[in-house]
Amino acid sequence: MEQYTIKFNQINHKLTDLRSLNIDHLYAYQFEKIALIGGNGTGKTTLLNMIAQKTKPESGTVETNGEIQYFEQLNMDVENDFNTLDGSLMSELHIPMHTTDSMSGGEKAKYKLANVISNYSPILLLDEPTNHLDKIGKDYLNNILKYYYGTLIIVSHDRALIDQIADTIWDIQEDGTIRVFKGNYTQYQNQYEQEQLEQQRKYEQYISEKQRLSQASKAKRNQAQQMAQASSKQKNKSIAPDRLSASKEKGTVEKAAQKQAKHIEKRMEHLEEVEKPQSYHEFNFPQNKIYDIHNNYPIIAQNLTLVKGSQKLLTQVRFQIPYGKNIALVGANGVGKTTLLEAIYHQIEGIDCSPKVQMAYYRQLAYEDMRDVSLLQYLMDETDSSESFSRAILNNLGLNEALERSCNVLSGGERTKLSLAVLFSTKANMLILDEPTNFLDIKTLEALEMFMNKYPGIILFTSHDTRFVKHVSDKKWELTGQSIHDIT
């Protein structure tokens, strides 16, 4: 008999006023590789925290059999302790053996991942492990997880990764229950789409039959009413003997029509109700009017050299940033992408910028700096927007259920959505986005793609999501060998 390592029993846990986790019984088994999926704010991280004993469910119990290693989503704090890590692992992941304070976001993620993987446990929990990781890091993670000997539960919006790793899908539904599917992500998506199509067919059939019966009942009621009116008129007249039988026949027909109408209505009552297929809220980021620039190349770099600590990142580089284009900066962790974005934003020596350029900057770890105020208050304060306008923006992003929640308890995806909403509410004509896709669910990613493709100004961004880069970039600049190469 297969041995379980995790057991949920009668869980009920409130997430927001309108959303909760509701799990009757759920098991994770030894050697099972589970992808936990669901939209931002549906409780994925909360579920992992319950397993790791960091969050206690309001009712119900979570049992675990075995030690747990947990890669947490929002905790990017790392210690300067290289002695506990395998040197070959550090080399394989290209993690520099210097102080963690000077590491990039991607290098910190690799270091933290190496810490978790170096210590084997029979239960491994990974919450968005690919955020900040370059191709080297993702490939390494993929290989490790393929041969991991234990129970794995992974939360990731990296569809390629979970497709290759997972043999079981846990999908958090709108009602807070969890649907379990045996198979990989693509198989689950295909089955789900077929089920939605079949549900739509049954729903349309149900509505059509309901309308047909309703019309038939109405027709019989009308027929009975007309017969009753005809009988009433005849009663007010002197009825000849030869018309008496005709009057009785009308009464009989009227009763028959009434009886048929009641029979049809009973059929309607006993008609098995079919629910409408679940439809998803379409997300939209705010699209403000921006200050236009009549300058083909409003930002120019001449002989730019960038140094971080003792490491030289760029040497005597030149580039021009064209107006109205989306430019992706790509390259391995630690090559200087974030440092270059900061240099451009602060317009350091070597970078000439038109005075008409107005920049807005989304920093890679922006989600760490939010104040302990409600979502609604944060957006109003950061954008000087009215309450009604702020409510409309949050509703468009599917955050209407969390208006009064503190920013400190939001999921990574919810924090990222909020940060981007603040940024996009400005009139900036240049957006600098450092890893904006981290934590975002698929629907929000699509909304971000739509926004970026419509944005009339400059967008300079970084992302390790190759599919996203392909969909939104006009140009690709690769940072390598202390230089920048256009690889569009």
Swiss-Prot record:
It comes from the Bacteria. SUPFAM superfamilies: P-loop containing nucleoside triphosphate hydrolases. Keywords: Antibiotic resistance, ATP-binding, Nucleotide-binding, Plasmid, Repeat. Residues 6-199, 299-487 form the ABC transporter domain. Residues 245-255 have a biased composition (Basic and acidic residues). ATP 2 binds at G331, A332, N333, G334, V335, G336, K337, T338. ATP 1 binds at G38, G39, N40, G41, T42, G43, K44, T45. GO terms for biological process: response to antibiotic. Residues 211-255 are annotated as: Disordered. Residues 222-233 have a biased composition (Low complexity). GO terms for molecular function: ATP binding; ATP hydrolysis activity. Residues 200-298 are annotated as: Q-linker, rich in Glu and hydrophilic AA. InterPro entries: AAA+_ATPase, ABC_transporter-like_ATP-bd, ABC_transporter-like_CS, ABCF_EF3_subfamily, P-loop_NTPase, PAS. Confers resistance to 14-membered ring macrolides (like erythromycin) and to B streptogramins, by acting as an ATP-dependent efflux pump. Belongs to the ABC transporter superfamily. Composed of two homologous domains. This is Erythromycin resistance ATP-binding protein MsrA. It comes from Staphylococcus epidermidis. The gene is msrA.
